[in-house]
Design a protein with these regions (language model features):
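Flexible active-site lid/hinge loop adjacent to a nucleotide/diphosphate
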Residues: 133-200, 335-341
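Active-site regions of enzymes building and remodeling cell-envelope glycoconjugates
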Residues: 36-46, 51, 70-76, 89-90, ...
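Walker A (P-loop) phosphate-binding motif
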Residues: 79-122
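Short, basic phosphate-binding NTP loop
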Residues: 1-93, 228, 294, 300, ...
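Residue-level signal for inorganic ion chemistry
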Residues: 20, 54, 94, 122, ...
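C-terminal helical cap/extension that packs against the catalytic core
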Residues: 269-324, 357
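Short internal beta-strands
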Residues: 28-31, 193-195, 262-264, 279-289
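Nucleotide phosphate-binding/pyrophosphate-handling subdomain across enzymes
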Residues: 3, 15-19, 117, 200-281, ...
Length: 357
């Protein structure tokens, strides 16, 4: 009996399983965090060659299990390979270290005023779950993990918002990360690079105008995604989506911020220390606070560390009952929270607890 193997059982792995189940195909799954029916130990190389197809999730680290020679001798399929083959929409690929989700969200809103589009991919909507959608445009948000494993890009148009060091714990160094990001250019399509002097919203209108007729009837009032420079109450900003130093420093500069900056998260993917200018006070909290103290430098700001957010907000409130606060963690969630949404919602709840009238 022919069988396929799924490597990794996160969001993409589950979508592979659903896809194969609907097609009534036999499969096994390897994920070191799961056990149960259909789950197996990682097969020896000689057995891997016997699978009909091997489907690989974006974050799966093959080098932990196989040599370079073994990896190069096997054929792996991504969910994007399947999507490119079986979905007939016009495919717009979007990548970048920061801003790709916001750009994709703006573009979707604009295109849906004059045509029809849907965001899939790293945005949280696995492409296989939308394999047969009937929209004209697929706006595919692509991470470096997805692009690194992609066999062949069949995008119709590519967009890069920016590239700065990120995920170096996975890619090893900035050059590997950059190389993965730039794989979005290896296609038949034109690639657009965002202009640093243009807002992402204006950039989205520019791209939409290259695809559809955008006129005065097209609303320029677009919704924003949560956890991106989101005002919780006047003077307090939730920027929990900030998962690297580049996004943290961008937020400070954009807001010309000089109040209380709050940082947290796991700094392992940051290649080196960085200087924070502007904020009068910097707070670092959480289980990674000692490591963060090694990375975050500030000659102009006082830096305080606390074990949890409650203690941070209590300290701020002692000095000012209506403070300016920027919560821009600058790191992945690590051991403190499940993800940036979880920590952003936690922050907003705590702000309302301490500072709402």
């Amino acid at each position: 009996m022919k069988k396929s193997l799924i490597l990794g059982y996160g969001i993409t792995g589950k979508s592979f399983a659903n896809y194969l189940t609907k097609k009534k195909l036999n499969f096994e799954i390897y994920d070191k965090c799961f056990e149960g029916k259909n789950f197996i130990a990682f097969p020896e190389y000689k057995y891997l060659k016997k699978y009909e197809n091997i489907y690989i999730s974006p974050g799966f680290k093959l080098k932990e299990y196989l040599s370079e020679t073994e990896i190069s001798s096997l054929k792996f399929q991504t969910d994007l390979d399947i999507f490119f083959k079986h979905n007939n929409s016009y495919k717009i690929g979007v990548t970048g270290t920061n801003g790709k989700s916001s750009f994709a969200y703006y573009l979707q809103q604009i295109l849906n005023q004059v045509s029809s589009g849907i965001i899939v991919g790293n945005f949280g909507n696995p492409v296989l779950d939308f394999l047969h959608h009937k929209k004209k445009y697929s706006i595919i948000e692509l991470s470096s993990f997805q692009l690194e494993k992609l066999n062949k890009s069949l995008l119709d148009l590519s967009v890069i918002t920016n590239i700065s060091p990120d995920h170096l714990d996975f890619h090893g160094n900035f050059e590997n990360y950059k190389k993965a990001k730039l794989k979005i250019c290896n296609n038949r399509a034109k690639t657009f690079f965002a202009n640093t002097n243009m807002s992402l919203k204006d950039f989205a209108f520019e791209i939409a105008s290259s695809l559809e007729k955008i006129d005065s009837n097209t609303s320029r009032s677009l919704n924003e995604l949560p956890h991106r420079l989101e005002e919780v109450i006047p003077g307090i900003i939730n920027d929990s989506k900030s998962t690297n130093s580049a996004s943290l420093l961008y937020a400070i500069n954009k807001l010309n911020f000089d109040g209380n900056l709050i940082i947290c998260g796991d700094p392992r993917k940051e290649p080196k220390s960085y200087e924070v200018y502007g904020p009068q006070q910097v707070y670092i909290f959480g289980m990674h606070r000692n490591e963060l103290m090694e990375k975050v430098k500030s000659r102009r700001s006082n830096i305080k560390t606390f074990s949890n957010l409650d203690l941070v907000l209590q300290d701020i409130k002692k000095a000012d009952s209506k403070p300016n606060i920027l919560f821009s963690p600058g790191n992945s969630s690590g051991k403190d929270f499940k993800n940036f949404e979880d920590r952003g919602n936690f922050f907003k709840d705590k702000v309302l607890e301490y500072f709402s009238d």
